[in-house]
Design a protein with these regions (language model features):
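Bacterial signal peptide processing site
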Residues: 18-22
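VWA/integrin I-like adhesion module and closely mimicked acidic/polar interface patches used
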Residues: 167-222
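N-terminal export and membrane-targeting signals
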Residues: 1-10
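Von Willebrand factor
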Residues: 30-100, 102-156, 159-160
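P/S/T/G-enriched low-complexity
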Residues: 210-247
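Solvent-exposed loop/turn segments at secondary-structure junctions
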Residues: 41-44, 81-84, 166-170, 213-216
């Protein structure tokens, strides 16, 4: 219980001082959004020295994201060696629960739900770290499918927060080994990755990234090819609306 309390407190601190995030908006509307979270459990996601400190980034960005995007629910997907088939699972959290009695305080219920969602994000991260690997594409596909299924006939907007450096590295494909300098090379690499795999059903979704391209082992001269590789997949082919944390 003490650990859980400390965790929630740490995550709540992320609400302060996070202006300028890619999802920041002056829109004060009340439209609700079904949201998803992709959590990278690969070895590069353990600290800022080896890549992206995913736990730290979650503490800094998750609650502001939920608040500023008016998320009504939060679903989860892990980045592991085989993200589609990973046993790391958590049911979507209802962030706007209906009061059961006339004396229930709706704002208190919402805060409890947000705290539960924050705690579940760390549970997902801890599980993913035990499976290692970095199938980012599979995680995006899994979260997109989950959101489509849970959305049902209610319509509404869909948004995904992906905390990952996007260094695809699974048993069948390692992005770091692919030449990406020319358009032809990038197209071959994209086709190679997508061979036998589903393109994430992200069409029309807002995809917000934290840690994108931040792996310190990647040479600065290779970033443009890396970025164009993912732009081809996410924007051109999947037709997502992508927002990176440095924009």
């Amino acid at each position: 219980m003490r650990t859980c309390t400390a965790l929630v407190a740490a995550l709540t601190l992320g609400l302060a001082g996070c202006s300028g995030t890619p999802w920041s908006s002056d829109d004060k509307g009340t439209a609700k959004v079904s949201c998803g979270l992709v959590v990278d459990g690969s070895g590069s996601g353990t600290s800022d020295d080896t890549g992206v400190d995913v736990k730290k980034k979650l503490q800094e960005t998750l609650l502001p994201f939920l608040d500023e995007r008016h998320c009504s629910s939060l679903a989860y997907a892990p980045v592991t060696a085989s993200s589609w088939n990973s046993s790391c699972r958590h049911s979507p959290v209802d962030l706007d629960p209906e009061p059961r009695t006339s004396t229930d305080d709706r704002e208190v219920l919402r805060q409890r739900a947000r705290n539960s969602a924050a705690g579940a994000s760390i549970e997902m991260l801890n599980c993913a770290r035990k499976q290692n690997g970095s199938d980012v594409l599979g995680a995006l596909g899994r979260i997109a499918q989950t959101l489509r299924e849970t959305q049902g006939d209610t319509g509404g907007d869909l948004a995904v927060l992906a905390v990952s450096d996007f260094e695809q590295a699974d048993p069948e494909f390692r992005l770091s080994r692919e030449p990406l300098a020319t358009k032809a090379e990038r197209t071959r690499a994209v086709d190679k990755l997508l061979a036998g795999r589903k393109l994430p059903a992200l069409k029309g979704m807002d995809l917000y990234t934290v840690g994108y391209g931040k792996n310190p082992t990647r040479k600065p001269s290779t970033y443009e090819g890396f970025d164009q590789f993912w732009t081809d997949i996410l924007t051109t082919r999947a037709k997502a609306h992508v927002h990176h944390d440095d924009e």
